[in-house]
Amino acid sequence: MARIAGVDLPREKRVEIGLTYIYGIGRVSADRILEAANVDPSTRVRDLTDDEVKRISAVIDETMTVEGDLRREIALNIKRLQEIGCYRGIRHRKGLPVRGQKTKTNARTRKGPKRTVANKKK
């Protein structure tokens, strides 16, 4: 099993699909990485040579932020927005949608499950 950027890639999948198991790498990024590393995208992960794995790892290390570093960077960006008190930071803090969506009816993913409010007695 090939281990790249601290992630074990599934042996039976093609390399371009296997690379997407790394956080921060999608299909397009995987294709670009393989092109830069001069590796055939249709090769299975189990058929990769040690040299090819090293070339792929080198390209990822040089050009991309992946896995823990990327997660940390995103968390720090959100924390910075909250500290400066901008609109996006406030929305993050309140757990509401950040990108301008309406919240009257939907937005349940960000808000969480409904909390029922008791009716006032007359």
UniProtKB/Swiss-Prot annotation:
InterPro entries: Rbsml_uS13_C, Ribosomal_uS13, Ribosomal_uS13-like_H2TH, Ribosomal_uS13_bac-type, Ribosomal_uS13_CS. Residues 95-122 are annotated as: Disordered. GO terms for biological process: translation. Pfam families: Ribosomal_S13. GO terms for cellular component: cytosol; small ribosomal subunit. It comes from the Bacteria. The keyword Nucleus does not apply. Keywords: Ribonucleoprotein, Ribosomal protein, RNA-binding, rRNA-binding, tRNA-binding. GO terms for molecular function: rRNA binding; structural constituent of ribosome; tRNA binding. The keyword Endoplasmic reticulum does not apply. PANTHER family: 30S RIBOSOMAL PROTEIN S13/40S RIBOSOMAL PROTEIN S18, SMALL RIBOSOMAL SUBUNIT PROTEIN US13M. HAMAP family: Ribosomal_uS13 (MF_01315). Belongs to the universal ribosomal protein uS13 family. Part of the 30S ribosomal subunit. Forms a loose heterodimer with protein S19. Forms two bridges to the 50S subunit in the 70S ribosome. Located at the top of the head of the 30S subunit, it contacts several helices of the 16S rRNA. In the 70S ribosome it contacts the 23S rRNA (bridge B1a) and protein L5 of the 50S subunit (bridge B1b), connecting the 2 subunits; these bridges are implicated in subunit movement. Contacts the tRNAs in the A and P-sites. This is Small ribosomal subunit protein uS13.
